[in-house]
Amino acid sequence: MSFDSIPILDLSLARNEETKPAFLRDLRHTLLEVGFLYIKNTGIPETLISDVIAQGKAFFDLPDEEKLAIEMKNKPSFLGYSRLGMEVTRFKVDWREQLDLSTPHPMPGPDDPLYYNLLAPNQWPSTPGFREVYEDYMTRMGKMSIEFTSLIAEAIGLPADAFDRFFDASQQHKLKIVKYPDLAELGVEGEAQGVGPHKDSMLTSYLLQASHHRGLQVQNHEGEWIDCPPIDGTLVVAVGQGMQALTRGVCLSTTHRVLSPARGAGARYSIPFFQGVSYDATFESMDVPESVTALRDEVQARRGAKQDDVEFTFRPGQWDHLGSATLYNRIKSHPDVGEKWDQYPEILAGIRKQHAQQGHVSEALPSG
């Protein structure tokens, strides 16, 4: 039997010693069976959430010249504005417009590893109040995400600080502000890919659904797509491939996608926050208690072979450092940035060679 809805967990229960054990049991069940959940009562002020949404939507109303002044390909950091259709997932164009931000870092030095290019200052729009709102939100979300990963650790029988070694000065939380135009604006009949089927990369990510539109879908174990509609007062949490690898498959990373809004529905907005880890770290599986791995084996045996549109690709030991893996994935998703900066052509050529050997051809990005 596979899941047919996404569970909702109340984070305030984890902050009360009397209700915390029940919360951890529910969290463990969700990690093993679903890998996707809503959380409510996060502690992020509602006034800040409202400001984040308002400022995010207003950004896309800026004149094109103001947005292009902070275009992603202006810098080798993969931070900044991406025009409609400039990102690729599973060799197809994602029909979305977005701004990528991160927690603050100074410019990398000349002797730093290449992946330190990712650790750089943001390109900020000039909108009054925008930077202050988003810096506040990212700071609060960073703290909350570390709290949540400590709860994941406890839920699967590890010490609360089991993941702390992945958080240091080269840790970079990331955030996207995303606009998905509807099919009428795109001039498309039927369906369009807002973002293609994928699994998130690292530990956990937290999505603020910033408009009333449906579109986010999660793939269950039978291959069916389950709606994950907006629910007021919640964030959607996705378990990343890194978390699945670290926990020996106990925490499930689940495939998800976004469909473009229907004709006449207007644009959908979302603001995902991606918990970062140290780019200098390597991933090695943790010693998860046998009682929990036995539960994992029981769940896997019960549900049988998993039908999944996206293969699990995160392999411990595949990369010298997590930063190298992250840089590779950024170049893969944003080939226009990879083409522009002379540090990246060898990596981009390797990606394209691998795709050609596998018989894949990526859709062409829009010109301009």
Swiss-Prot record:
Statement: the UniProt record of this protein carries the keyword Oxidoreductase: yes
Binding site for 2-oxoglutarate: 268
Practical uses of the protein: FR901469 inhibits the activity of 1,3-beta-glucan synthase from Candida albicans and Aspergillus fumigatus. With minimal inhibitory concentrations (MICs) against Candida albicans and Aspergillus fumigatus of 0.63 ug/ml and 0.16 ug/ml, repectively, FR901469 displays greater inhibitory activity than other 1,3-beta-glucan synthase inhibitors such as, WF11899A, echinocandin B, aculeacin A, and papulacandin B.
The protein's annotated pathway: Antifungal biosynthesis
Listed Pfam families: 2OG-FeII_Oxy, DIOX_N
Gene Ontology molecular function: any one: dioxygenase activity
InterPro entries membership: DIOX_N (IPR026992), IPNS-like_FE2OG_OXY (IPR044861), IPNS-like_sf (IPR027443), Oxoglu/Fe-dep_dioxygenase_dom (IPR005123)
Database matches in PROSITE patterns: FE2OG_OXY
GO biological process, one term: small molecule biosynthetic process
PANTHER family: 2OG-FE(II) OXYGENASE FAMILY, PUTATIVE (AFU_ORTHOLOGUE AFUA_3G14880)-RELATED, OXIDOREDUCTASE, 2OG-FE II OXYGENASE FAMILY PROTEIN
Similarity annotation: Belongs to the iron/ascorbate-dependent oxidoreductase family.
Function: 2-oxoglutarate-dependent dioxygenase; part of the gene cluster that mediates the biosynthesis of the antifungal antibiotic FR901469, an inhibitor of beta-1,3-glucansynthase, exerting antifungal activity against the pathogenes Candida albicans and Aspergillus fumigatus. FR901469 is a cyclic depsipeptide containing 12 amino acid residues and a fatty acid chain. The NRPS frbI contains 12 modules responsible for the formation of the depsipeptide backbone which is denoted as Acyl-Thr-Ala-Tyr-Val-4OHPro-Thr-Thr-3OHPro-threo3OHGln-Gly-Thr-Orn-OH (C71H116N14O23).
Entry protein name: 2-oxoglutarate-dependent dioxygenase frbJ
Organism: Dothideomycetidae sp. (strain 11243)
Gene (name only): frbJ
